[in-house]
Amino acid sequence: MIKLVYCITKKSGLTDREFFDYWKNVHGPIGTRIPGLRKLVQSHRLPVPGDKHQPDRQKFDGIAELWFDDVEALLAARQSPEWQTSTADEANFIDHTKVAYFVSEEHILLDNLSPQP
């Protein structure tokens, strides 16, 4: 299983609320139709009052994680009309000059999210 990770920044002129609402409720359903996509997660930035550890250089507003079986499935998905529709829609809420992405393989070192007996 591989994961495509997008670090995104909202388009200028959008409030946080407008950005997160559009991303989740309009763009999100578009993304769920991408063929071969096994899992889709959005992580929306939360402000932390007094946080001095946020870098001043690049500030992202969120992260999208798209899981595929393998790189071949990702490459096939990128050729699909659904991917093209999703990419075109990004212009409505993302500043493409402030985006970073990479393909990764997850290595879980700790998972205490499951209830313990």
Predicted regions and their residues:
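Macromolecular interaction modules
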Residues: 1-117
